[in-house]
Amino acid sequence: KNQDTMKVLPAQVDIDLTNVCNQDCYYCNSLDHRTNMPVQKKYTEYIDLIDKLATWRIHSPKSVGTLHTVTFTGGGEPTLLPNYERVVEHTIDHGFLTSITTNGFKLEKLLENVDYNKLRKMGWIGIDIDAGEEELYEKIRRTISKTSTFTKVMENARNLVSVGVNVDFKILLGE
């Protein structure tokens, strides 16, 4: 290796935590990906990855750029990774601007297990909502639940906002 080569570092990294999903959205473009790659890593592997990424935050004369932002997303639902909230907290602890793109159904684990002061340091939690009313939401998301998924997602969003977390609602437009 040539030690004089400059490294170009990204400002942001997106990490797919899992391919598992708890919804069956009619428009999903990840279904084939989820079906053919159902393997899920352990949360400790993501903790190790965040530790490695933290070394990219150190300024060096041999690198251009600094990693600032980590966004958790997935070919599935990132909050379904067991102990995902520990990975999120670890990322915040390393000083990364941390965000999650989610369907919003399992966000209560963040509120139950991560200090609110840490949660307030997050960049945002982006909730894919797709509809502003329950009946259409349930039709698009094709969820199977004894209770309203829409109601639970809205409750999770309200609870996060009430402690100062920046929540963004995202929609997919189509015909």
Residue ranges of model-derived segments:
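Conserved AdoMet/S-adenosylmethionine-binding subsite of the radical SAM
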Residues: L81-E175
